[in-house]
Amino acid sequence: MNKEICGEDENKKSDKLINRYILRGRKFVDYACFQYGAYNAAISGEADANFIDDYQYFVFTKSTKSLETIRILLRNDKTEDALIVLRSMFEGYLASRFIGEKYDRKLLDDFIFFPQIIASNKTYYNKQNKKHYLKSNNEALNYKQRNPAEMIIGKDKSYYRALYDYLCMFSHCNYAILPHYLDENGFFDCDGKMDCFMVKILVLFIYTKIFESIVTVEGEDFFNIREESECYKLVKDATMY
């Protein structure tokens, strides 16, 4: 790892924060993440707002697993590839916040039920009117797939465009990032060229937002007071960092 670029002391601090997030994130998944919406629907026969928890816990679990992957990539100087994974994490944060703050029953169809139906190959797509239809009875699904720009809320608008465009450059084959795949002599090279410390800052920024919006929210259950204190302290330390 290029310590001259990263700054060894700051690099260690950021590593410790990432490690702490993985530890607390995994614990939260184990003791708190449960499909409350699906459980209640199985009993009552109706879908309700508890599915918001299901979706947000899904995003949190997926993001925590992605954080572990990013840690492995960064340890192996695959910084550009870490940004590819980070883009998916950022999209998850936007969707999770959107469904939580803009909830209505229709969003459950768009975010949870219709995607499952479509993925199970129970529909066909009409290119002319751009709609999905059930194969069983030709009924149209009133499905809206939102792009990330449609789910920005509040202060996220102030930085979304710059951050998302930057992440997209690395997840697409954008020729603007060519220098990251060349050595000092202009030959193609698979070794990392990016400032790994900058990438870690972006990782901490995005995962902190996910952790803060799902874990350290009013009414969330912790299995003991110490765990609650550690989670709030972690968010504070990462934010101040």
Residue ranges and their predicted role:
Residues M1-G92, S96-Y241:
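A cross-kingdom marker of C-terminal helix-rich interaction/assembly modules
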